[in-house]
């Protein structure tokens, strides 16, 4: 198994693992694995990185990142580029049928929850995370209660099979967004027998996403100089940083941490606003005034989070500082153009968040920031348009629609009991 201890990054103290999500100082707990060097295992999909995943068992799921050297986009931009592709692309060997790298979070998180005696998991999502966890719940039968804003429930589908009875979808209407869904999910998670998924605080989620960097480094035989990703909460950026530190300690993949290039989608860019002013703290009235209106205007609203793990110890701010990172604000027009460019040069469709990352890559290359450097672009989701033509999909229907996060718990209990 991936033998590990949990450690507070600020105090260095070991934290007992009871599906622990918090330490005393509020920092993001990290895993320290007994295996200091990475050994690839003969296991399905992402589980080849078993030694650096916080679980004893594994799932029989094929989803994993596939990293390849770009030709078309690399030539267009004049850079040395590898693409870490997460999605559905059979010719490439990419078989992530929910078409999002959230499928890297769900398997270790659900396995970890089961191993710690969890009876049911509760999570909130704007779409992609809910889809990945619902898929894994359907495969494993592990009970899942997922809370999603009403305008996003069309994103909640299962590839290749009917949704399992283990999945209970609650839709939050009334103009509610992802943060409202989080607030309701937190209330449900406080009920007896319920286990919160944990978001960025859950080491299984972060270490699952961190396998993107592991796959890139193994494929390239060394860590990249630069790493590009679009962010909503920023958890993927944190995960890439943490994985890089493990690779550095391994000793075979280089000693310099990759520079993080993290992109937010205008007009909702609270982390970018705080970062530009050198602040660890996000000031809501300054960094995200009229947040719901801004979120409604985004090209990719899954990249919205009003309470991201930015200033917390071991969070986005620390990751950016440690890697001399850069942050970008991408417009709708830039993202749309980047999506067309990638698809024309690489030959596969990509989801809107990935297009935001491509747009940041274009900006950086045009500024000459990537000359003579080895670059990784994390395509966090792709191949969905193709999958829809080749694989039957089944919509997950809500068991309950509520007007907002303050709904009486009696209504919730009727449908989740």
Swiss-Prot record:
Q: Which keywords does this Swiss-Prot/TrEMBL entry list?
A: Coenzyme M biosynthesis, Pyridoxal phosphate, Transferase
The keyword Transferase is annotated on this UniProt entry: yes
Q: Which residues form a coiled coil?
A: none
Per its UniProt record, the required cofactor names are: pyridoxal 5'-phosphate
Reaction(s) this enzyme catalyzes, per UniProt: O-phospho-L-serine + sulfite + H(+) = L-cysteate + phosphate
**One GO molecular-function entry:** L-serine ammonia-lyase activity
Top-level lineage group: Archaea
UniProt record, GO biological process? coenzyme M biosynthetic process; D-serine biosynthetic process
Metabolic or biological pathway: Cofactor biosynthesis; coenzyme M biosynthesis
Q: Tell me, how does this one assemble?
A: Homotrimer.
Q: What PANTHER family has UniProt attached to this entry? A: SERINE / THREONINE RACEMASE FAMILY MEMBER (PTHR43050), SERINE RACEMASE (PTHR43050:SF1)
- Family named by the database record: Belongs to the threonine synthase family. Cysteate synthase subfamily.
The record's annotation in HAMAP family points to: Cya_synthase
Write the protein's name: Cysteate synthase
**Originating organism:** Methanocella arvoryzae (strain DSM 22066 / NBRC 105507 / MRE50)
